[in-house]
Amino acid sequence: MSKTYIGIDIAKNTFDACFIAHNTWQNCTFTNNQQGFMELTLWIQAHHYNTSTLHLIIEATGTYWEKLAHWAISHHHKVSIVNPLYIHAYAKSLGIRTKTDKQDAILLARYGAKENPPLWQPKSDNEIKLTALLKQREHHKRQLIKERTRQEALSIYVKSYTDDNIRHWSDSITQLDHQIWQLINCTPELNHRASLLATIPGIGKKTLPHLLVAIGDGSSFQSAKHLASYAGLAPRHHQSGISIHKQSSIGFSGQKELRSALFMPAVIVSFGRYPAFQKFVKRMEQKGKTKKQIIIAIMRKLLTISYAVIRQNRPFDKRIHE
């Protein structure tokens, strides 16, 4: 039985849906709320499609997609959440320059039919809670940095007035760290994954929770390369003939917090502190890579190894991951 792919381009208040089946397509716009979800159901039923053949391809726009995705799962629909960068690249490969909500929905459906992306599984309640705690910690960390920077610019006569704010944000970060690790230690699946990640040289207590949130059980990513792309760590090459040969870069897309969490471990690894990665660092140096390129390559390597140990359910092995 062939699948029917429904592409969904979502915004804060509305979403456009388009299905492609038997070389024909139909599209419609709905409100991004429970009423709109029910109207989507009626629209699907009006076209006599079996729930078991439906596959919803939803673009990951902010957090606007989450309610619809959870609703779809509760109604036994297959769901894939797709990185907008993939759709942009797919449109570029087809030579499509027009960008409208309806056009994006059509593209998502076509992308689903061509790539059959992995199915999305909702996070457990504790994974959702861990994500929320980490976001709150990041907010408090930004506020702490802001206050410290502000204090440096203040006159010596008024610096003491910011001390209370700095103390407040520092204490709240300490409390959040305690809650984060209490949650990890008390949740069997999180604790197990954490124990696997902890075997990777360079991965410490500050980085580990970010990896748990980003990777989950690993099923949301087709490969380690897809995870690296999601994190914004996939290399971009710019080379043509013999005249154009620019330095590779990673751009500025993807998960900024995850990259930030991986940065310091990568810096430490780059100085040869961990024997397990010394050969890798030397190979990069012999290729003439800059220090920045080496650090980015190590960040990517730490991330892909993290994915591997979780997917394979095996601790770090120097012989495999060297």
Swiss-Prot record:
Organism superkingdom: Bacteria
InterPro entries named in the record: Transp_IS110-like_N (IPR002525), Transpos_IS110 (IPR047650), Transposase_20 (IPR003346)
One annotated GO biological process: DNA transposition
GO molecular function: DNA binding; DNA strand exchange activity; transposase activity
Keywords: DNA invertase, DNA recombination, DNA-binding, Fimbrium biogenesis
Function: May be the site-specific invertase required for pilin gene inversion. Moraxella can express either a Q or I pilin; the inversion of 2 kb of DNA determines which pilin is expressed.
Name listed for the protein in its UniProt record: Pilin gene-inverting protein
